[in-house]
Design a protein with these regions (language model features):
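Metal-dependent nuclease catalytic cores that hydrolyze phosphodiester bonds in DNA/RNA
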Residues: 1-143
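Flexible loop/turn segments at secondary-structure boundaries
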Residues: 15, 44, 160-162, 203-204, ...
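A non-catalytic, helix-rich entry segment at domain boundaries
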Residues: 41-97, 302-342, 346, 523, ...
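Conserved RNase H-like, two-metal-ion catalytic cores of nucleic-acid enzymes
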Residues: 102, 115, 139-143, 338-424, ...
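Conserved DEDDh/DEDDy metal-dependent 3′-5′ exonuclease domain
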Residues: 106-109, 117, 121-132, 146-147, ...
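Acidic, Mg2+-coordinating catalytic module of metal-dependent nucleases/exonucleases
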Residues: 194-198, 207-277, 283-286, 490-567
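Helix-hairpin-helix
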Residues: 271-325
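RNase H-like, metal-dependent nuclease domains and their acidic two-metal-ion catalytic environment used
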Residues: 344, 353-389, 530-576
Length: 576
């Protein structure tokens, strides 16, 4: 293939001023701080997150298994361009890949690709003959029109890319287009398409248009991202994420492992509080505010900004504007905003505070669950707290195993406990307080799995909805996360202080910790379960503290759904 010499540029190893095809990730996620941390963080004392309970490591291992099983089922005779991904930096990996292409192998896994003129390189999961793809997936991939060249196929252990994960799809599409550009120039034929295999599109790959021509420069958007990446990589030591916008942390991006903790430190060191700390303010709304001269939250705290029309920003409606204004007013004046307007049940005869720990469906048994890959989405831990004669009580319920039958047994025990506590006694008023809709829809899902009808008849009250819909603002809280509300309440009224553990960096780490617990001979006695229990109790005790503070602020009467007209979030609490 004539493109090999041009692809290498005469180098034996990838030079330091090239970009990997995965290098656009942080920029697409609008979080250039991650790129700065990767290349310069250690010089400034920043360290990666601990490996233990890393969700990134977990999902990376799952992705590798997904690719292996896809090959086993669809292309068992695939050959490998590289033994290890990192060998892509050596010219021998590229030479082997090109030799396999010249031999006409229909499927090549771990294909090394370089293109020196554009300073890019990378390892494609697969490159496949277009005819092989068309024969294997006749409904998704067309037969070649002329020469039978190679096209890029990447395997991603994710789902719903085409419907609800626009940023992820854009990120993966950039990778595939970069791979395709290199492949096209090496083989002398630019592919029209590349393909994404995902867990819900195993035999129906997602098509990605390449939209570049042979011998032409890289697409302008990809070139822009490449140039920015290389500038940060090569010259980023001159920048500081806490003061330079070009490498600033993106608060809207939660996929920040392995730099989650380092990024938190940087956010605390920022010269001004980021605008994205406000509810529903993302990158688009931030640009809109900056156009009006607001660079930081402090700019919005001046009295002159009190009447700013947030509804003029893209995606901000009337209710969202009211939330933002309540948060700003509280932090501007130091006063609690809106609490006197909150609609709550009166103190009930039975009040319980509940939180669930949940497993998503990504812990998959690839051997036994192929191709459905449904995993085991269950609630594995329930925390319930209450006050008994003024003394805090806490009880937890844990599934003995990571199986649906164990979840059912746990819920049967939980429902028996609720019965003893009087939750189902129609002669008594009762409420189960929680934070966010998760507990309600997870309980409904468990009811569907197990036929436990009582789960659909629980008197839930979503305290987060009380705060967000009233809306309530309190100094120190810029949003409506449980932890920040609990912390703000404790600062405002120290008698309502509730401590918070710092063992877990995120809910995703909690899931990985739970999965690790179930690998142990006695999972319920494992250190992981002990840590999760402490975290769970902090959640439910925080709920109790917030409710008591709110009742102290607003001892108003119970209103039913019809009387209030606010959608009925409180109507599930049962009046005696």
């Amino acid at each position: 293939m004539s493109g090999l010499r041009k692809a290498t540029g005469g180098y034996d190893e990838v030079p330091s001023d090239w970009m990997s095809a995965t290098g656009t990730r942080a920029l697409v996620l609008q979080d250039p701080c991650l790129l700065w941390l990767e290349h310069h963080g250690h010089k400034f004392g920043f360290k990666e997150d601990p490996e233990e309970y890393s969700f990134l490591s977990f999902i990376g291992a799952a992705g590798q298994k997904f690719e292996e099983h896809w090959l086993k089922n669809f292309a068992p005779n695939a050959v490998y361009g590289l033994e290890k991904d990192w060998d892509v930096r050596k010219v021998e990996g590229l030479q082997r890949t090109v030799a396999l292409m010249q031999a006409g192998h229909p499927v090549i896994s771990k294909a090394a690709l370089w293109w020196a003129p554009e300073k890019i390189y990378g390892t494609a999961d697969l490159i496949c003959k277009q005819s092989w793809l068309a024969e294997t997936f006749p409904g998704s991939c067309p037969q070649p029109d002329g020469r039978d060249g190679y096209v890029v196929v990447d395997a991603k252990f994710t789902r719903n890319l085409a419907s609800s994960k626009a940023a992820d799809l854009r990120m993966y599409s950039h990778q595939l287009r970069l791979y395709s550009y290199m492949l096209g120039n090496i083989q002398g034929q630019m592919p029209e398409s590349a393909y994404l295999v995902t867990r819900d599109r195993i035999a129906d790959p997602i098509r990605v248009g390449v939209e570049m021509e042979l011998g032409q420069p890289l697409d302008p958007e990809l070139a822009r991202l490449r140039d920015l990446h290389l500038h940060i990589k090569l010259h980023g030591a001159d920048y500081r994420p806490w003061q330079d916008e070009i490498v600033a942390p993106g608060l809207g991006n939660k996929k920040d492992e392995p730099w989650h903790l380092a990024k938190k430190k940087i956010v605390k060191a920022l010269r001004g509080t980021p605008l994205e700390m406000l509810p529903h303010i993302g990158a688009v709304q931030k640009k809109g505010l900056q156009a009006f001269g607001f660079e930081h939250l402090e700019d919005l705290l001046c009295p002159e900004a009190a009447e700013f029309p947030f509804h003029a920003l893209a995606g901000i409606g009337e209710q969202t504007e009211r939330r933002i204004q309540a948060v700003l007013a509280a932090n501007r004046t130091g006063e609690v905003i809106g609490a006197e307007d909150a609609i709550l049940p009166p103190r009930c005869d039975v009040e319980l505070f509940v939180d669930f720990e949940f497993f998503s469906d990504i812990n998959v048994d690839f051997e036994n669950d192929w191709p459905k890959l449904n995993g085991c989405p269950i609630i594995f831990m329930i925390g319930a707290g209450w006050l008994e004669k003024g003394t805090w009580k806490f009880r937890q319920f844990v599934a003995a195993e990571e199986y649906p039958d164990a979840e059912r047994k746990m819920f049967e025990n939980f429902l028996s406990f609720l019965h003893k506590m009087g939750i189902f006694d129609n002669a008594r008023s009762a409420a189960l307080y929680h934070w966010s809709p998760a507990e309600k829809w997870q309980a409904d899902a468990a009811e569907s799995r197990h036929g436990l009808k009582r789960l659909s008849d629980l008197p839930w009250v979503d305290l987060r909805k009380v705060f967000a819909d009233t809306p309530i603002g309190i100094r120190g809280a810029w949003g409506y996360g449980l932890k920040e509300i609990v912390m703000a309440v404790g600062e405002y009224a120290p008698q309502f202080h509730s401590p918070w553990p710092e063992d877990l960096s995120s809910g995703l780490s909690a899931m990985v910790m739970g999965w690790e617990a179930y690998k142990q001979p006695r999972p319920l006695d494992s250190p992981e379960m002990s840590t999760l229990s402490k975290y769970l109790e902090a959640d439910v005790k925080g709920l109790m503290t917030v409710l008591r503070w709110l009742q102290d602020q607003c001892p108003g009467p119970y209103h039913n759904q019809q009387a209030s007209g606010r959608g009925g979030w409180y109507a599930m609490a049962r009046a005696g």
